[in-house]
């Protein structure tokens, strides 16, 4: 090897070695091209089902009593969990403050917050999809009474 480098430096090279190397590399490429697709290594293939099963969606039910409980609700949203929040056991002023805090959290995460009942809200992270309206059902119930 050292002699080859020295020979190339002075412009003297052994062309026979280069020809053998070229023939070897071209024949190797031809062999790889003729292999069937089934014999190719599949180390980088992952089942889609295994990825779906690892991420389970959860919905957390929460009844805050004080303003500091808003941090727990926000933490659940950060952990990609939807949260149903019932404010029936809180004063309206404290409930408004928590709704404002959670609205900011949801906005920062690109999620959604929806009113689903009297003093009940649903806050969802961005990967959750909600469909339909409960308010239509509540209006029909009021008309029946």
From Swiss-Prot:
**Cystine pairs:** none
Q: Which domain of life is it from?
A: Bacteria
Q: Which GO terms describe its cellular component?
A: cytoplasm
Tell me where in or outside the cell this protein is found: Cytoplasm
Q: What is its main location?
A: cytoplasm
Q: How does it assemble?
A: Homodimer. Interacts with FtsZ.
**UniProt-recorded name of the protein:** Cell division protein SepF
User: Which gene codes for it?
Assistant: sepF
């Amino acid at each position: 090897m050292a002699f080859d480098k020295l020979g190339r430096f002075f412009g003297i090279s052994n062309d026979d070695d280069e020809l053998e190397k070229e023939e070897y590399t071209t024949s190797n490429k031809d062999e790889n091209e003729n292999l069937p697709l089934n014999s190719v290594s599949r180390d980088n293939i992952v089942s889609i089902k295994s990825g779906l099963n690892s991420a389970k969606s959860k919905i957390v039910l929460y009844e805050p009593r004080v303003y500091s409980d808003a941090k727990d609700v926000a933490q659940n949203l950060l952990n990609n969990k939807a949260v149903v929040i019932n404010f029936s056991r809180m004063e309206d002023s404290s409930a408004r403050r928590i709704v404002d805090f959670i609205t900011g959290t949801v906005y920062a995460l690109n999620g959604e917050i929806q009113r689903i009942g009297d003093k009940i809200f649903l806050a969802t992270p961005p990967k959750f999809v909600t469909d339909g309206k409960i308010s239509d059902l509540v209006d029909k119930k009021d008309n029946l009474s």
